[in-house]
A protein has these predicted regions:
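Specific transmembrane alpha-helical segments of multi-pass solute transporters/efflux pumps
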Residues: 37, 42, 73-120, 155, ...
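A helix-boundary/kink motif common to multi-pass secondary transporters
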Residues: 53-54, 112, 202-203, 267-268, ...
Length: 341
């Protein structure tokens, strides 16, 4: 995760010793579990959209998630492991996360969850634009032919998914598409904000603080705008209550723990690459469980979009390898000059 300059860093060995002893098959299992958790959330939220409004959905799910993360934050505070600067650093990421979450959840009332999750790939466009402006060291990568080709395929593919349903003229569908785009771009801004402001903080503590801010904001929004000020959830049947609880537990609480563990064990590139399969998993399950399907043209557009995303990720990975080789060469030359003296 990312941060303000001068933030207190948590040594890697303090956070990932157990992960480093994890077998590769265990790392793969964690990554698959992450994909399963995050693929289940759009299905739960889409089902619940028939029973509660999105303000109530967000307030209860993120409120419960904030309570889940609260003990970790309090434990870190008690040990003196939580720098005071983290509270200010987390404000911008939390605002971006809150707005993106509102768009994400409300979109489920209007569009197929598979269409929405394909639309979320647009976060890579927001990340590219933001990284070009904020991180000069990445401009060469973003200007590369592979990266730009990937972005082009991504945008073209997502346009095929969003516009290929044949009913864009319907107001509700147009609103859903706009919300899907807003959610994708919003999560991209959130990722940039995390990288810019949260660098150096332990990822679990960083997300814990962001979850507290986001949960508090969404609970306040629920009380202000939700039907019955959020009390509508008390009218849900036992099955829908289970779905609401599972969507919070699997998607926000456990899902993020698994995600960070997968990154630590399998690496960012592998983790991000596997998670590009999410729209296909969601689309398949939505067809089976909800009877909601995409057209053949939309599936084709989705495949083009994911291929573009994979090309972008491969360009980033190639740039990381080049930087690592350059750093190793500089260190070797410095060591040689030192020994010559």
């Amino acid at each position: 995760m990312s941060s303000t300059q001068g933030a207190t860093k948590i040594p890697a060995e303090a956070s990932s010793a157990a992960v480093r002893h994890m077998r590769r098959w265990e790392g793969v299992a964690v990554l698959v579990a992450t994909l399963a958790c995050w693929s289940s959330v759009p299905l739960f939220v889409r089902h619940l959209a028939e029973y509660i409004d999105h303000w109530t959905n967000n307030g209860w799910r993120y409120g419960a998630s904030a309570l889940f993360w609260l003990p970790a934050v309090l434990w870190a505070l008690g040990r003196g492991a939580l720098p005071r600067s983290i509270w200010r650093a987390a404000l911008v990421p939390a605002v971006a996360n809150t707005l993106a979450q509102v768009a994400f959840t409300s979109a489920h009332s209007y569009v197929n969850p598979a269409l929405l999750t394909f639309g979320l790939r647009l976060q890579l466009v927001a990340v590219a634009l933001g990284a070009y402006l904020l991180f000069p060291s990445e401009r060469e990568t973003i200007r590369s032919a592979r990266y730009l080709c990937g972005l082009g395929l991504l945008v073209a593919g997502i346009a095929g998914v969003l516009l290929g349903g044949g009913n864009l003229g319907e107001g509700s569908n147009a609103l859903g598409i706009a919300l899907a785009i807003a959610a994708g771009m919003g999560y991209g801004v959130y990722g940039l904000a995390v990288r810019r402001f949260m660098y150096g903080f332990h990822p679990v503590y960083a997300f814990g603080v962001i979850a507290l801010y986001t949960g508090s904001a969404l609970v306040v929004a629920m009380l202000a705008f939700g039907r019955g000020h959020g009390a509508e959830v008390l009218e849900l049947g036992s099955r829908e209550l289970w779905y609401l609880g599972l969507s919070a537990f699997l998607g926000i609480a456990v899902g993020h723990v698994l995600y960070y563990t997968a990154i630590d064990r399998m690496g960012v590139a592998v983790t991000a690459g596997v998670l590009q399969l999410q729209p296909f998993v969601v689309g398949s399950m939505a067809a089976v469980l909800l009877g909601e399907t995409l057209s053949a043209g939309q599936w084709l557009g989705g495949m083009v979009a994911v291929a573009g995303a994979a090309l972008v990720l491969s360009a980033q990975k190639a740039a990381e390898r080049r930087r690592a080789r350059a750093t190793a060469l500089e260190e070797a030359e410095a060591a040689g000059e030192s020994s010559a003296r």
